[in-house]
Amino acid sequence: MLAAMGLELVFSLLLLWTQGTQGSTLDPAGQHVCKGSSPSELQCCPGWRQKDQECTIPICEGPDACRKEEVCVKPGLCRCKPGFFGAQCSSRCPGQYWGHDCRETCPCHPRGQCEPATGDCQCQPNYWGRLCEFPCTCGPHGQCDPKTGLCHCDPGWWSPTCRRPCQCNPASRCDQATGTCVCPPGWWGRRCSFSCNCHTSPCMQDSGRCVCLPGWWGPECSRKCQCVRGQCSVTSGHCSCPPGFHGIRCELPCNPGHYGAQCKESCGHCELNATCSPVTGNCESCKPGWNGTQCKQPCPAGTFGERCTGQCPRCRLGEPCQAETGHCQHCDPGWLGHRCENPCPLGTFGKGCSSTCPACAQGTCDAVTGECVCSAGYWGTSCNSSCPAGFHGNNCSMPCQCPEGLCHPVSGTCQLGRHGKNALIVGILVPLLLLLMGIVCCAYCCSGTRLDPKDRPERNGAAFFRMKQQVWGALTNLGSALPCGSLSNYKLPWVTVSHHDPEVPFNHSFIEPPSAGWASDDSFSSDPDSGEEDEAHAYFVPPREEMVPMAQEESPEASLPGGSFPPPEDASTPFPIPRTSSLARAKRPSVSFAEGTKFAPQNGRSSGDLSSPIRKPKRLSRGAQPRPEGQEAEESTGPEQVNTEEDAPTATSSGDPATSHGQLPPGSQMVAECAETTDGGIQESSGSVATIYMLAGTPQKPEGPVWSVFRRLGNYQKDQMDPKVKSAIPKPLRRSLGRNQASAGSAPGAVLSQAMESTAVRPEETPRGLGDGIESSGTVQEPDAGGSSLEQDSQKQAEEKEQEEPLYENVVPMSVPPQH
């Protein structure tokens, strides 16, 4: 039961395996092969099972299953096994039938029978052939082959038909084809009638000579060999030793270095003199330069070393190197060393480097030919010539790859030709010229109108000094247009300039130098080139546009074109401070200077209410030290006379006096014109004092780049600038300070208007000047009344020049703006 279940399981597994593999191995032209669901898929037709590439196994399953005695011949059809028939399939087929249920007829009958399953014929004796159709010809002493018909004779008979008897010893047999006797061992002769006498060794059948067995020798094989190894000669008994042994009896092994029969062969080049195999002669490893199993083959040409893995160097004419070491026997010219790897030393060349090189100026000689190989940039036999134009490199052998054909003789980099150099020069000069033109234009734009040659000081270096004044004045005018405030971070000490005049009021101004690059801490600098420190101190006061002088509004000269006074931008013209003697003679207001001090109104009064209207002017030195009393007495001419016949212009204060003395913001460079005057008009009985506050001193920070450029520009133009008279802008008449006291008392606007009417010069055409780094407020110059003042000016100009008397120029009366 278990066996049946096991067989059924195996059969099912086999069925599944065949079904799984049938789709991939079937032949489309095989038996019972059908197409599947797709054209490319093949499968067995229903009722058939795959076998190899066809479907030749029928399937009988279920109700159509066959019994044990039956086989399935077609799907669902069972028959008896071949050779049987009947209801139980137990009866054998008759001789003339074969196959399933004995349905096939046997063609061999009656001379043979068919095989039940295949139908092959089995012939009866004396018949042969495929269907047993041929009778045998062997007679009674032989049998024929059923396939071929050849006769097999019985012993003692021979011939093709087995009809001839043999003529041999009965114990022997004869050849069936020839009838020759074949003797058994120990017998010899034509009929095998003689016995051999060879001591158990066979003898030759035709001659009876003994053929000795191994270990025996002699004519009758009666002598035993004495060899330990190998075989002895059957005739002489000498031992034939096997490879690796030698001696009479082959009892000795081969000596080291030898191998083979009788140890007659020598070993090859085994490594470290190792012995080779005494039998074969093979080496475990070979010496360098040898190859092969027996190390008897040298390395192929071009190789050397162990196992011939090294490559030979380049020897002379390509000859092979030594197979063991790789050394060259000879080297090519220009090389040295065992492997010809070292070039000739400097100064030698040729075969074996035995020749001396010629002199090469810029290069080395060729190690082979001895010719000079020039360095880059040189050529010639001795390398003493530079490369011609258009070539570079070693021996000047490479042409230049440049548009103009010129290149560096060593590196080959392109160099500029005539056109390239011109383009480079133009490219450099054009920006420089543009920059220079910009600087010149900037300088002329900032310098304003040049001074008339007669207005320049006559001391040495005055042109350069006045040029610097123009530059600083232009910058200061730019700063004056800005509102009160700080433009930088310079901190300067306070300097107070007080003016005492009962007739002319002054505004109070906080003044700052236009440049931070003062050379010293002096309050007022002199011309650095003049050498005179105490004369002609120039000051500069930038005006404010909103400050309109009262005299200009009230005077009749205000109706003139442009007004009777210069415009605010012309009020910045520098003027020299007059000497005390000149002030006394001209009845000018006395001016006193105190450096480093600060005057403030006391007891609630403004600076215009100071005590005495009559003060002696003091001359200010560089160190702000007073002059000796004797000198002051000499220069002083007495008390000033105050003109009370005309009313002085009313001056109003634009701010609180207390605020006028407030500290400026730190580092201020702006002119902070915060005017400070008295609240009421100036009284005739008491003298009015106007105080001007100025910032002076050495800055705490270095000058900026803009100021440095302008300062250097002034130094450059010091010797370049020639005095030229500008005819386009006429200068107003210079008004010298009168020395007679009779000239005092006229109104400031009257004389000035007369002078302008006589010269027909507009006040706004008056040129502006610059101070030498210090700004000051202009004091009002009161011209003398009457027409004689103009004549006196022309007569006294020469006298004032000789005395180098400082003059006032383009003085604008400063008044407070009108009250709103």
From Swiss-Prot:
Glycosylation site list: 291
Residue numbers carrying Phosphoserine: 590, 607
Residue ranges crossing the lipid bilayer per the database entry: 423-443
A single Gene Ontology CC term: plasma membrane
Amino acid composition bias (Polar residues), ranges on this chain: 650-662
Membrane topology: Single-pass type I membrane protein
Disulfide cysteine pairs (residue numbers): 60-72, 66-78, 80-89, 102-114, 108-121, 123-132, 166-174, 168-181, 183-192, 221-232, 225-239, 241-250
A GO biological-process term: neuron remodeling
Listed Acidic residues bias regions: 631-648
Keyword Mitochondrion on entry: no
Intervals, Extracellular compartment: 24-422
Residues in the signal sequence: 1-23
Gene Ontology MF terms in the entry: low-density lipoprotein particle binding; scavenger receptor activity
Annotated compartments: Membrane
EGF-like domain boundaries: 56-90, 98-133, 163-193, 217-251, 304-341, 353-384
Function text: Mediates the binding and degradation of acetylated low density lipoprotein (Ac-LDL). Mediates heterophilic interactions, suggesting a function as adhesion protein. Plays a role in the regulation of neurite-like outgrowth.
UniProt free text on domains: The cytoplasmic domain is necessary for the regulation of neurite-like outgrowth.
PANTHER family documented for this protein: SCAVENGER RECEPTOR CLASS F, SCAVENGER RECEPTOR CLASS F MEMBER 1
Protein's name in the database: Scavenger receptor class F member 1
Source organism of the structure: Mus musculus (Mouse)
Taxonomic classification: Eukaryota, Metazoa, Chordata, Craniata, Vertebrata
Gene: Scarf1
